[in-house]
Structure formats: C-alpha cells, structure tokens
C-alpha cells in the first residue's frame, strides 16, 4: 500500500498574471474575429496603474486596443481604485506591437518537403514539446487536485461578482492537497484560500476578527457549494482549511504584484500532475503549436481514457519549425493501459492527425472567436484550458473518437 499527498493550485481572474492572460487572449479574439488568418503573439504586463501590451501581430483587423484592454480590466472587477487598487478607467495603457518575423511566417506558410495534401503545406510555428494528460479521477477526466482548485477559484469569483460577500476584491488563489492511496484519491487533506478583501468588514476591524469571519464565510459560500456534487467531500473536522495565512490580504492585484502573460502555465494545464513543455497558451494564434498541439495532445489523452484503453495517460508531442508532421509522439500509460505504451503510441499515430493544419481544421481554431460572438480564447485564460464543461471546448469533445477506438481495440 503506497500513500502520498499531491497538491495543485489555481488563481482567480483578478490575479495579476491572469489579468495579463485574459488581456492577451482578448486581443487574439478581437483580431481573429475580423481576420481568421491573423498571426498573433501578444504579451501583456500589468503593474500599479499601468498595462503594456507588446508582441507581434500581422493582421488586416482594426482593433481599438486601448479600449479593449480597459474593458477586460473592468469586467474582471477593477472598476475603480477602491475595487482592488487598480482602476480600468485611469490606468495607463501602452501598445507596442510589431509585425511577425518573415522568417517565422515562411516556416508556417510553406512547410518543408510538403506534398499536395493541404495539411502538409502548413508547418509548425516553432519547435517545441507539448504534453497532454487525462485520467479517470473526475467526470471531465482531469486530476482531482487541479479540478478542485479550479472549482474553488471559480466559486470565489462567482460570489464576488454576485455581491454575496461584499468585502471580496478581485485577487485570489486556491490550493488543494489530496491524499492518494495506490494512486487513487481517498481524502481531501488541505484547502488553502487566499482572497483579497477590504480593510474593514462590517463593524470588524481587528485582523483576527476579520480572518475568522472570512474563514467562516468561505467555507459556507465557497467550499460547500463548490464540492457539493463530489463523491470525495471535504470534512470540516478532518480537512485543514487555511484562509489568508498571513492574516490579511488588502493590497493585491497589480498594485501588490506585477503581472505577466504566461506565468501560470501549470494552473492552465494539469496542476503539476503531468509534465509541461514550457510554452504558454494565451495571446498565441493557432499556428503556434505551444497552444494548438497542447490542445491536440489533451484530445488524444482524453480519447484514450474515455475509450478505457488506459486509466491515465500522458502524451508527448514534439515539432520542428516549418515541418508539418510531429518529430516524435510518445504515450505513457503508467502501467494502467490495456496494451503497452508502444502499442498505444501506434494507435495514436494511426488514428490521430497531429499536423498543425489538421489540428486547426479539426477544432476550427481560427474561426471559434467569430463563431462565438467575438469571444472564445479569453474564456480559457482563467480557470484552466482543460476539463471545462462550461465552455464547450472542441478538444474536450471525445465521445466520437472514443467510440471509434473502442470499436477497433476492445
């Protein structure tokens, strides 16, 4: 019998790094909505009273970037200086966007050694490695720790937007530690929530009283509703519940910490339960395999688990710039598969087209923003890119592919 504790974290949409991810993806959405062939690599930086967007864009779209940035910040909840120390109306917004390098554009536009197949003509936008993962711990086939951390972060933001707890401010983080026995989750060991709040709550002003009040409220309005439908429930007597462990969290958001696009890549994926290739997602158009191939790798892994060919699977893909076909494909099932890793890898090579052009076409990645009223990627930029039944993500829809695999290999 082997037992261990695994921990994952999430952050709310008001976290400085997540503000930047959402801004970068809002820019991407706006450009792709007007011009689906836009090439975008947009980074954002926020600090006290400042937002900078920079990077490379080649597009025929015309976008009011300054007003777009302000609208994102405002929707998150930074509507005035009292709402977390960052004001959408008065912060400086700087724009420094260049065009995509012609050397990179050439690699995408004309793949090396391409055939008459149109998908062979589109090369990867960069070299790199990407990982996808799935397991049978949750209905959405995600690891339980990151799934729970996202649930708590979403619920925390939800009650703030609804005004349930009027003292809540936009910045926040959640963390969940799960006890495993023989690789199966058996209990929730610890929950940590750090949430920004006003300096006073009702008639309370002492740090101890405020912390006690927040702790009681968050268990009632965040933890309980976020976990009510789970088989594995937190226990108020056995589960450690830590809230704002330093005592208070008044100064937060960009006033408390600078934020950058792409600094929450583990939050965006599997909470550390699987490996990560290092490439961030937000602000990148679908020709960037950091994003599109990571989505495809998740689709492959989830399809395998949904077909019950394995209980948990990690898929590694690698690419070279300007080359359409993956350089390598590797499947690791950790001994949980109905066949060997080598056989599973053969299944993937036979049944999944992992060329960038095919991935873009299968998931309609260039057209999703225009199909969804100008907003798609921005909604993936907070609370995870995977295991999101609320967003109707094409790389999460594996039923048909799973049926195909079941018919062929069961």
Curated annotation (Swiss-Prot):
Cellular localisation: Cytoplasm
Residues the entry annotates as binding K(+): 43
GO biological process, one term: one-carbon metabolic process
Pfam families, sorted: S-AdoMet_synt_C, S-AdoMet_synt_M, S-AdoMet_synt_N
Cofactor annotation comment: Binds 2 divalent ions per subunit. Binds 1 potassium ion per subunit.
Cofactor: Mg(2+); K(+)
Region entry Flexible loop, spans: 100-110
Main location (coarse class): cytoplasm
Alphabetical keyword list: ATP-binding, Cytoplasm, Magnesium, Metal-binding, Nucleotide-binding, One-carbon metabolism, Potassium, Transferase
GO terms of molecular function: ATP binding; magnesium ion binding; methionine adenosyltransferase activity
Positions of ATP binding: 15, 171-173, 248-249, 257, 263-264, 280, 284
Function as written in the Swiss-Prot or TrEMBL entry: Catalyzes the formation of S-adenosylmethionine (AdoMet) from methionine and ATP. The overall synthetic reaction is composed of two sequential steps, AdoMet formation and the subsequent tripolyphosphate hydrolysis which occurs prior to release of AdoMet from the enzyme.
Family designation: Belongs to the AdoMet synthase family.
Name of this chain's protein: S-adenosylmethionine synthase
Gene source species: Prochlorococcus marinus (strain MIT 9211)
């Amino acid at each position: 019998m082997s037992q261990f504790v695994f921990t994952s974290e999430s952050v709310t949409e008001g976290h400085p790094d997540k503000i930047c991810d959402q801004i970068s993806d809002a820019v991407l959405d706006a450009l792709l909505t007007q011009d689906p062939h836009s090439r975008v690599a947009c980074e954002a930086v926020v600090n006290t009273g400042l937002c900078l967007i920079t990077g490379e864009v080649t597009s025929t779209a015309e976008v009011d970037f300054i007003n777009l940035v302000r609208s994102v910040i405002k929707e998150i909840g930074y509507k005035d200086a009292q709402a977390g120390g960052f004001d959408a109306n008065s912060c400086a917004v700087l724009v420094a966007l260049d065009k995509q390098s012609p050397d990179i554009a050439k690699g995408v536009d004309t793949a090396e050694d391409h055939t008459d197949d149109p998908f062979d003509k589109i090369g990867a936008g960069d070299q790199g490695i990407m990982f996808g993962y799935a397991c049978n711990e949750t209905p959405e086939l995600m690891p339980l720790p990151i799934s729970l951390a996202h649930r708590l972060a979403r619920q925390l933001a939800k009650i703030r937007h609804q005004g349930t707890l009027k003292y809540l401010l936009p910045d926040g983080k959640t963390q969940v530690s799960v006890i495993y026995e023989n690789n199966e989750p058996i209990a929730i060991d610890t929950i940590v929530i750090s949430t920004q709040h006003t300096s006073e709550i009702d008639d309370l002003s002492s740090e101890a009283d405020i912390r006690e009040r927040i702790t009681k409220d968050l268990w009632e309005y965040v933890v309980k509703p976020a976990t009510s439908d789970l088989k594995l429930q937190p226990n108020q007597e056995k589960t450690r519940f830590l809230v704002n462990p330093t005592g208070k969290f008044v100064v937060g958001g960009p006033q408390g910490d600078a934020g950058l696009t792409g600094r929450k890549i583990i939050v965006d994926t599997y909470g550390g339960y699987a490996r990560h290739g290092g490439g961030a997602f937000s602000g990148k158009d679908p020709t960037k395999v950091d994003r599109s191939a990571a989505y495809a790798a998740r689709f492959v892994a989830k399809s395998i688990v949904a077909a019950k060919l394995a209980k948990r699977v990690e898929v590694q893909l690698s690419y070279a710039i300007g080359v359409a076909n993956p350089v390598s494909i590797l499947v690791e099932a950790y001994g949980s598969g109905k066949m060997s890793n080598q056989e599973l890898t053969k299944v993937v090579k036979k049944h999944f087209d992992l060329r960038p052009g095919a991935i873009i076409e299968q998931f309609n990645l260039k057209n999703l923003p225009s199909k969804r009223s100008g907003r798609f990627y921005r909604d993936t930029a907070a609370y995870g890119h995977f295991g999101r039944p609320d967003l109707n993500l094409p790389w999460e829809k594996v039923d048909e592919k799973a049926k195909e695999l079941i018919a062929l290999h069961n």
